[in-house]
Amino acid sequence: METLQNVVTGGKKGGCTSGSRPLRILLVGKSGCGKSATGNSLLRRPAFESRLRGQSVTRTSQAETGTWEGRSILVVDTPPIFESKAQNQDMDKDIGDCYLLCAPGPHVLLLVTQLGRFTAEDVMAVRMVKEVFGVGVMRHMIVLFTRKEDLAEKSLEEFVTHTDNRSLRSLVQECGRRYCAFNNRASGEEQQGQLAELMALVRRLEQECEGSFHSNDLFLHAETLLREGYSVHQEAYRCYLAKVRQEVEKQRWELEEQEGSWVLKVLPIGKKLEVLHSDFCWYLVLAILIFFVFFFLLFYV
């Protein structure tokens, strides 16, 4: 297991050299969605603790390594940091450790969600992913549906195309229609086949991004900290966690600003005129009040 201590003491992830172009995959999504089981399917071994229940087993970020067709793969599993109730005193540490394990940045973020169960919690998880990693993170996102076996005779494309879940349709569009499905109980040829399908999507994504990975200021800070070497008890680590808090807050503000701008763009012209008219009315009322106050002061005081 690739622990945080292995990383902070200068160990290289999986013993990979820079020339081997290791693929870094970050698992994201709401608690209990099957991230750990998906990680095990990716690595084709029980690397992460996984149980068949709707609650998260993973308590801290964990990285495991494997290979696919000769290429080294680093898979990072995440604790419950992508939900509104996850705001607690350990949040900064959980996010900071996730950045450290995935530095200098992930090539792919796998958003794991259960087939036919994309709920408000999943929508919140997507928003939290943007807050934690920045608004540009969707450029490197692939949606991965678990419970592929539930499709029965229907194809995944049919399911996605004809779903009446608007939030899911919007997400798929935002991710450039990059999606696939896993049966995490599969083995042998079935497991190999679904993994090959995902890796084909990964190659397409890497071509679109010209081989780049997702990065931001916080990943640069994490990389610097790793390069310098440190202890989790040192002042440098505490300063890093303070930076985590600042950067996530900044990214949250940028997301809210972007959403506000988007709302104005998609408002119908009539609605925009209503907003403008409403603002004008308020200014008119304010101007009249000021006039009467000035008139009263001028003639009666």
UniProtKB/Swiss-Prot annotation:
Q: Name one Pfam family in it.
A: AIG1
A GO molecular-function term, please? GTP binding
Q: According to the UniProt topology, which residue ranges lie Lumenal?
A: 301
Q: State the oligomer form and interacting partners.
A: Interacts with BAD, BAK1, BAX, BCL2, BCL2L1/Bcl-xL and BCL2L11/BimEL. The interaction with BAX is increased, when cells initiate apoptosis upon IL2 withdrawal.
Which residues are involved in binding GTP?
G29, K30, S31, G32, C33, G34, K35, S36, A37, S50, R147, K148, E149, N184
Q: How does it sit in the membrane?
A: Single-pass type IV membrane protein
Question: Among its keywords, does the record have Isomerase?
Answer: no
Q: Domain named AIG1-type G: which ranges?
A: 20-223
Q: Where is this region: Required for targeting to the endoplasmic reticulum?
A: 263-301
State the family it belongs to. Answer: Belongs to the TRAFAC class TrmE-Era-EngA-EngB-Septin-like GTPase superfamily. AIG1/Toc34/Toc159-like paraseptin GTPase family. IAN subfamily.
- Top-level division of the source organism's lineage: Eukaryota
Describe the task this protein carries out.
Answer: During thymocyte development, may support the positive selection of CD4 and CD8 T cells. May play a role in mitochondrial DNA segregation in hematopoietic tissues. Binds GTP.
Encoding gene (name): Gimap3
Q: Which organism is it from?
A: Mus musculus
What is the tissue specificity? Expressed in thymus (in thymocytes), spleen (in splenocytes), lymph node and, at lower levels, in lung. Highly expressed in T lymphocytes.
Q: Which conditions up-regulate this protein?
A: By BCR-ABL oncogene.
Where in or outside the cell it occurs: the entry states: Endoplasmic reticulum membrane
- Note whether Transport occurs among the keywords: no
Single biological process term from Gene Ontology: mitochondrial genome maintenance
What Gene Ontology cellular-component terms does the record carry?
A: endoplasmic reticulum membrane; mitochondrial outer membrane; mitochondrion
Keywords attached to this Swiss-Prot or TrEMBL record, sorted alphabetically, are: Endoplasmic reticulum, GTP-binding, Membrane, Nucleotide-binding, Transmembrane, Transmembrane helix
What this protein is called in its record is: GTPase IMAP family member 3
**Regions that span the bilayer:** 280-300
Give residue spans on the Cytoplasmic membrane side: 1-279
